[in-house]
Amino acid sequence: MGAKPGSMKPSTVARGLGSVSRRTRARLVHVLKERGIRSLDVLAAVGSVPRHRFVDEALASRAYEDIPLPIGYQQTISQPFIVALMSEKLIAGSAGRKTVLEVGTGCGYQTAILAHLYEWVCSIERIQLLFERSENTLATLEVHNVELRYGDGYEGWEGGSNFDSILLTAAPEQIPPTILAQLAPGGCLVAPVGKAADQRLRIVSNKGGRFYEEEGEAVRFVPLVPGISE
């Protein structure tokens, strides 16, 4: 699904579109409403974040279609409906919305959505070139309530704990205990879990130190891979 490693560079990320982008974002919000997204905060975030700035210039005209798109390095930017659905489940299940941990920054689009929903976003990316690209894009868009790290998402956020929410944007076969341990009481974790042909969303709640798990929709994500890639 993704392009070959290194085939997409930060300099090719789309800019411009202006008022066209605003109109197409509004249409995308309407599509998400029709598909069942109800959170006004999530819909407002989708309506505010310019998705075309997170994809290659050649794909900018398709940025507001409800489809995933390649971002290089065998990775994709998720379908807007899935981004909205996971974000909606995340905030609905979380007692607080101060801090959120995202495992898998990718191009930074989901990160930007979370920045509209939480006071502070911590995000880890294992692919160095994607980390650099997302850092540059978010800085250009003046998204300042985020901290990005290049590292192994399997290990969670070094020195961090008690996140109100945790979101995984790649699928492990089982949720790593190191990540689950960083979820605060009253917090919610949302992740795609399973092998490629059999993945479903998992919604995990921390209720007084005990974890309760709920199964959600069938999804398809790239696998969560341990380690880092230069």
Where are these regions (language model features)?
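Conserved nucleotide-cofactor-binding alpha/beta core module
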Residues: K89-Y212
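Class I SAM-dependent transferase core
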Residues: G2-L101, Y109, I113, L117, ...
